Amino acid sequence: MPDKKRRVTDFVKGGGPYVWVTAYDYPTAKLVDEAGVDGILVGDSLGMVVLGLPNTLGVTLADMVRHTQAVARAAPKALVVADMPFMTYETGPRDALRNAARLIRAGAEAVKLEGGSEYAHVVEKLVKAGIPVMGHIGLNPQRVLALGGFKMVGKTEEQKKKLVEDAKALRDVGVFAIVVEFVPASVAKEVTQSVDVPTICIGAGPHCDGQILVLHDVVGLSERTPSFAKRYANVAEQILSAVRQYVQEVRTKAFPAKEHYRDV
């Protein structure tokens, strides 16, 4: 549990295991920060988790700025990283710099972008401009249309080789950490051993330098929990129970009771 503010320089190889979780608003970010996570990702997964979209492609930079502002206000200890959403960096370093700067001004202390060696030149420009970058290889949700769905990556020798090459390319241009998503555990282990920056797994086994999960999966608010996630609570049932009781008490006029209001 961090007892001081986490910085990107605190994330070093061999210093983990590092604990990351997503958060998208002030109250949940405040809770996970108090719980002692090392890092909070304001993920573009908010499109699916919070906004009800079928994937992350509809998330805008304005969405990310607003949610990053809320999370940053609530997290005095954890490192806050914001996702760069679809088509905010693919068009080149100039656009990436301008868009990343908006997220930094919103309170992010680093940005995360998906992709490997094909975006190394973009990452390099951001890092040289003083913007810390977290890489993201393996399953890239922003490529879901090209991939034909949310499918495991790294099952072939060619894919495995590409993942290792991508990790090294991102390491070479200065990322401080790399998310490795939904790849075989043995491949994640090889990727982790190939670079001297921390790897953070999601659905990629125990061999990375840390783990990250979507908060709603952790607390039981998701409609469906992925096979690689663990549900530690059932908050959805608690909310349902509480609101159903509220509905019943209002309709039977049991609420508000005398202690809930004042009279002159």
Swiss-Prot record:
The active site is at 181 (proton acceptor). It is found in: Cytoplasm. GO terms for cellular component: cytoplasm. Mg(2+) binds at residues 44, 83, 114. SUPFAM superfamilies: Phosphoenolpyruvate/pyruvate domain. CDD domains: KPHMT-like (cd06557). It comes from the Archaea. Its EC number is 2.1.2.11. GO terms for biological process: coenzyme A biosynthetic process; pantothenate biosynthetic process. Binds 1 Mg(2+) ion per subunit. The keyword Magnesium applies. It holds the Pfam family Pantoate_transf. It is an enzyme of class 2 (transferase). It catalyses: 3-methyl-2-oxobutanoate + (6R)-5,10-methylene-5,6,7,8-tetrahydrofolate + H2O = 2-dehydropantoate + (6S)-5,6,7,8-tetrahydrofolate. GO terms for molecular function: 3-methyl-2-oxobutanoate hydroxymethyltransferase activity; magnesium ion binding. Catalyzes the reversible reaction in which hydroxymethyl group from 5,10-methylenetetrahydrofolate is transferred onto alpha-ketoisovalerate to form ketopantoate. HAMAP family: PanB. Homodecamer; pentamer of dimers. PANTHER family: 3-METHYL-2-OXOBUTANOATE HYDROXYMETHYLTRANSFERASE. Belongs to the PanB family. This is 3-methyl-2-oxobutanoate hydroxymethyltransferase. It comes from Pyrobaculum arsenaticum (strain DSM 13514 / JCM 11321 / PZ6). The lineage of its organism: Archaea, Thermoproteota, Thermoprotei, Thermoproteales, Thermoproteaceae. The gene is panB.
